[in-house]
Amino acid sequence: MAQVLPVEITEELKQSFINYAMSVIVDRALPDVRDGLKPVQRRILFGAYQEGVLPGRKHVKSAKIVGEVMGKYHPHGDAAIYDALVRMAQPWNLRYPLIDGQGNFGSIDGDPPAAQRYTEARLSPIGAEMLLDIDKDTVDFRPNYDGSLKEPEVLPAAIPNLLVNGASGIAVGMATSLPPHNLSEVVDALVAMIENPAITLEEVMRHLPGPDFPTGGKLSKKGIKEAYATGRGSLKVRAKVRVEEKGQRPVLVVTEIPYQVNKASLIAQIAALVKAKKIEDIVGLRDESDRQGLRIAIELKRGANPQVVLNQLYKHTALQTSFTVNLLAIVDGEPKVLSLLDLMRHYLDHRKEVVRRRSLFELRKAEERAHVLEGLLIALDHIDEVIALIRGSEDAPKARIALMERFGLSEAQAQAILDMRLQRLVALEREKLLEEYRGLMEEIARLKAILEDEARLLAEVKADLLRVKEKYGDARRTLITEFEETFNPEDLIEDEPMVITLTAQGFLKRLPLESYRAQGRGGKGLLAGRTKEEDEATHVFVADAHDDLLLFTNRGRVYRLKVYELPEMGRQARGVHVKSLLPLAEDEEVAALLSVRGLDQEGYLVFATERGLVKRTALKEYQNLGQAGLIAIRLQEGDRLVGVALSDPEDEAILATQEGQAIRFPLEEVRATGRDTQGVIGVRFKKPEDRVVSLVVVKPGEMVDLLSVSTRGYGKRTPLSEYPLQGRGGMGVITYAVSTKVGRLAALLKVRGGEDLLVLSRRGLAIRTPVAEIRQYSRATAGVRVMNLPEDDEVASAFVVEEEK
């Protein structure tokens, strides 16, 4: 009679949940450390083996295998069994598939497989290796779910499946994620451990440097050793991409993608980024994969930088992913996080036990056969007497007893004599039996040595591993390399030339140099920026996007921005106010700009002020330039910076004034001082209202011209050799013939002849013209028209655009 026991619901929930959790952990989601299989996978392989669906035989319907497994060993849904079977057949999921599938088993695009009634399957050769010697009492069996049959607790696993195919699974409160590896490398590492049980992780990694994913790709070295040592970690995996040319356009060709990435989803992800204009240089995207292999073609704009686009794709798409490592497996019925060395030792212990039990089984069989052969040989030695004894017996049992009593035979030996065919009585057959017996005795001796000697046992394990490597070993697919796992902004932004403009009211912007097309000398120019009527452009120059932009203020402070941090806008846009980018005081404004590639280089900064002062300070003094800025120069009341340039100790400086005067002197006359200093006199003015407009730094004897640009848009080139070297502090010589027609000097620039000149007016017009079109004149001349300006406009700034190399 049934008995009802009252139980606290909290206690029942607690106990039931623990039972459920342990069932999921041990019997469903986590692999056994010995064969690397979950129960459903083990049952599928064993069910296929029992059905005789072996390599070399014909495929059978997947539904037949699923039904066999479900009915005999795994009383759960057929969908779960079929899903597990399909995954073991997918070469993009398993490094070494255990099932050989025929038909539609899905795709790397995430397409579902055909129904089980349409597909066919059989064990793959490697799958069969998992069951090798299972008929030799190598593993323990247990009753199936209803006690009607026996199923293996673990497979013999001649293949180190957990290491080569990895595993993934989510249990209750824990999850496992083991990466796949290359079989040849795993075997080499296991052999090294057999030869040196005290082997270190570093020594193992000489043979097994890292995971080897079925889809190939690139794997970062960073994190591999830590994951192997602790059992936990994260590895960065990238697609393999090469650059091809199609016409004049670069094409990124993806040939391998990261493990467990859905190709169709990846392509959709890239397309979405292009549509959202997060990546702007992609003009075409095609999936060109076929039976020859995976191929995704990403066509770029003409002139685009493939590496920058690739870095953007790595950052924003699954072309770069993280593989989480959690080496969790079932050990003696309990889940444990293991190191790589632990995994290897557990597998070797399992194989030692399998080989020991196999040897014991084979020894027993060999001894039984040798025992029978001994009886047969005795019978052949007394064949006439044996025949007479058998003929004289009433029946077989009495004949067996008579043989046992007469020759001291066992029942098995006597029965074997009775079962012997007459043809074995010939002399040749006796020789064959003797040969077989001698062979058996050698085999028995070998098997006993294996069982008695640990070294011989390990040698047998090693031989099995080397056989597997010889038969199934292949080349590594995943390239282990070093790459930056995270991206700096520079990695995602093309290092292209940018035009930087700053207005009198402090509006700053950048736009690509290619926006300014070259025009002939004397043109009207293009609108470069919309300014308010009272606003004027004061600075324009060209710098690369990755350069450091140093901004010097009227208070003598310096700030730093990356050029790419400036807002990129169209030619007619005003820009963003500099105070939204820098922590400037209320009455502080930018007075001079300079671009450098890093502040840790040798050299000096040369400063020139409007009142003719000049100062020299080592560039390294500004290395600690942070968000808050630094003091760059101490300015006198009413004075302001007009120019800053990089220099070497042996260089010379030229200061040019708006009234057309210029002085050239060696910079060694300007003693290098600290940041918070004022400087010394560089030039004296003929007219009190004159002021310095340009600072030029040249090398001694440099074969260059000095290009003068006036406020009314006139210009000329004059050889540097026409400017005598003087001592600093003088009035210099005439460099430009100023007049009402041509205006005053706006800028003096160093040119070689192959560059372009970029001129910006106060009303926002800009012109870019080849320097070679501007003729050479002597110092005391005005030159030719460079830019045709309206009466109410004048040149604000000019800059030389270096020739492309």
Swiss-Prot record:
User: What are the EC numbers?
Assistant: 5.6.2.2
Q: Does the keyword Oxidoreductase apply?
A: no
Q: Which UniProt keywords apply?
A: ATP-binding, Cytoplasm, DNA-binding, Isomerase, Nucleotide-binding, Topoisomerase
Location of the protein in the cell: Cytoplasm
Q: How does activity depend on temperature?
A: Optimum temperature is 65 degrees Celsius. Active between 25 and 77 degrees Celsius.
Motif GyrA-box: where in chain: 519-525
Q: How does it assemble?
A: Heterotetramer, composed of two GyrA and two GyrB chains. The two subunits form an intertwined dimer where the GyrB ATPase transducer helix of 1 subunit connects to the Toprim domain of the other GyrB subunit through a 10 residue linker. In the heterotetramer, GyrA contains the active site tyrosine that forms a transient covalent intermediate with the DNA, while GyrB binds cofactors and catalyzes ATP hydrolysis.
Family per UniProt?
Answer: Belongs to the type II topoisomerase GyrA/ParC subunit family.
NCBIfam families this protein is in?
gyrA, PRK05560.1, PRK05561.1
Protein name in UniProt: DNA gyrase subunit A
Please name the source species. Answer: Thermus thermophilus (strain ATCC 27634 / DSM 579 / HB8)
Q: Which gene encodes it?
A: gyrA
